[in-house]
């Protein structure tokens, strides 16, 4: 698997590599899939998806962040692999997405409405704030699209006085859903 290069930064920062690995696993993208990301920021998730999915669309409302995505795609040899849209979701969301990643909490209710209406098969939303995690979980449930809630935290080891200690990242709440089949209520 190719390493993702992110030489261009955005103030919000990229989705961490370990978190991207779990996102990739939950999305299970194939060559036949149309993947859509809402809130591409640095393009870290978009880059990973462009290596797996047959078609990729990334939306970003901030022009400077979209340019960061564009530059990072180019740095990874994927400049022509992604359709970039400078838009605030749900505007300009395609109606034929197979998989959707929501990287931010802005307008997620409207984005989830769109996903439910268009039958998106795989939906993943990452949340870092507890209050938003609770509200977003309820939003998934209200639309009967929740399949799983995962909370995890990554810690990296560092040397301390000749031994190994750990520095923890903020926890991530990952909501996984589907508007086309098996949901939490079905299990």
UniProtKB/Swiss-Prot annotation:
Class of this enzyme: transferase
Binding annotation for S-adenosyl-L-methionine: 15, 39-43, 60, 89
GO molecular function annotations of the record: cobalt-precorrin-6B C5-methyltransferase activity; protein methyltransferase activity
Alphabetical GO biological process terms: anaerobic cobalamin biosynthetic process; methylation
Enzymatic reactions: Co-precorrin-6B + S-adenosyl-L-methionine = Co-precorrin-7 + S-adenosyl-L-homocysteine + CO2
Keyword DNA repair: no
Gene3D superfamilies assigned: Vaccinia Virus protein VP39 (3.40.50.150)
Enzyme Commission code: 2.1.1.196
Family: Belongs to the methyltransferase superfamily. Archaeal-type CbiT family.
Protein name as it appears in the record: Probable cobalt-precorrin-6B C(15)-methyltransferase (decarboxylating)
Naturally occurring in which organism (per UniProt): Halobacterium salinarum (strain ATCC 700922 / JCM 11081 / NRC-1) (Halobacterium halobium)
Lineage: Archaea, Methanobacteriati, Methanobacteriota, Stenosarchaea group, Halobacteria
Gene this protein is translated from: cbiT
């Amino acid at each position: 698997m190719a390493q993702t290069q992110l030489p261009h930064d955005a103030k919000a920062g990229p989705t961490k590599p370990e978190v991207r690995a779990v996102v990739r696993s939950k999305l299970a993208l194939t060559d036949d899939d149309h993947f859509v990301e809402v809130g591409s920021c640095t393009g870290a998730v978009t880059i990973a998806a462009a290596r797996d999915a047959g078609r990729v669309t990334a939306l970003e409302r901030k022009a400077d962040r979209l340019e960061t995505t564009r530059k990072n795609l180019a740095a990874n040899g994927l400049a022509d692999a992604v359709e970039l849209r400078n838009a605030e979701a749900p505007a300009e969301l395609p109606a034929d997405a197979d998989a959707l990643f929501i990287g931010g909490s802005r307008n997620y209710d409207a984005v989830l409405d769109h996903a439910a209406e268009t039958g998106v098969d795989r939906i993943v939303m990452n949340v870092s704030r507890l209050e938003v995690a609770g509200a977003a979980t309820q939003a998934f449930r209200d639309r009967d699209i929740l399949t799983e809630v995962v909370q995890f935290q990554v810690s990296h080891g560092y040397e301390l006085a000749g031994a190994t200690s750990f520095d923890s990242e903020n926890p991530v709440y990952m909501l996984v859903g589907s508007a086309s089949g098996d949901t939490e209520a079905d299990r």
